[in-house]
Amino acid sequence: MKKLLYITVNSKPEKLSSSKTIGRAFISRFVELNPEFEIEEVDLYKDFIPRLEHKHFSGRSSVVDCETASIDAKTKEEVKRIIELSEQFKNADLYVIAAPLWTLSFPAPLKEYIDCVVQNKITIKVTPEEVKGLLDDKQREMVYIQSSGGEIPWLTKGIFNKGLNYVEDVMKFLGIKKFHQLLVDGTGFSIEEKFKAEDKAVEKIDNVIKDIHFSNKG
């Protein structure tokens, strides 16, 4: 089966989070149309995501060998988790990230997660001559779902969407060339504004799915 890796980065319960509400609607609809996909989920506020430290590494983006390195049990478990997250990321076909817009970017746990999954000999290759992504070995695509309280004018999206732009740049460097966005703009201050923004985003879901290369498109 193909794998859809669903990554959320919001501490709110799903029903209170617009990004997670639309994320759930998206993956449910996608799997309805593409039942050959299985879903794996990572909640960056609930799951253990190590904060990278020098003790985890033996070289540039290269974690230590747990079998030979002189490290304590806690560090060994952290290194194993870093490798596990990176391997899980490598094994996926479709990635869906659901995140709110915070301070022109995204919540900090997403950056810590990205740092974990970008590892030498798993998702990138690091040599003295070059650093290159390794995820161009098969068809992979990403959908970035972002909620924001206000409407972001088209002309200023490059200024205010620094988080989205950063994620797109990193994924393309890794080898994930097709990047789709689903914006939940204008969630506002009232429950009515929130529901209206979510309804508008739900209407966009099928069009995003149609652009995904390996989708059955309904």
Swiss-Prot record:
It comes from the Bacteria. This is FMN-dependent NADH:quinone oxidoreductase 1. Pfam families: Flavodoxin_2. Signal peptide: none annotated. It catalyses: 2 a quinone + NADH + H(+) = 2 a 1,4-benzosemiquinone + NAD(+); N,N-dimethyl-1,4-phenylenediamine + anthranilate + 2 NAD(+) = 2-(4-dimethylaminophenyl)diazenylbenzoate + 2 NADH + 2 H(+). It comes from Clostridium perfringens (strain 13 / Type A). Homodimer. FMN binds at residues 17-19, 147-150. Quinone reductase that provides resistance to thiol-specific stress caused by electrophilic quinones.
